[in-house]
């Protein structure tokens, strides 16, 4: 059974989905400590994203900055296609849709 996501993410789901949509993303998921709800006050936020088409570095960078402003935390963004093969299964298994 998957754990519930951190309250910080739960309280901003609508805004995060809106941001994702505005940058052409078809999917945004949280993984890592925020998905396991074992994050500390210093934890960053890890997002796994997929686009409905090719994703530009500009779009991903702008999303990263907007998400950091919204959440008040450091944010990391990775695409499904960029996941390292050794991490892929774990990340896909623990990631939670927003």
Language model regions located:
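Short hydrophobic/aromatic beta-strand micro-patches
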Residues: 48-50
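Conserved histidines in hydrophobic membrane contexts and catalytic metal-binding motifs
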Residues: 30
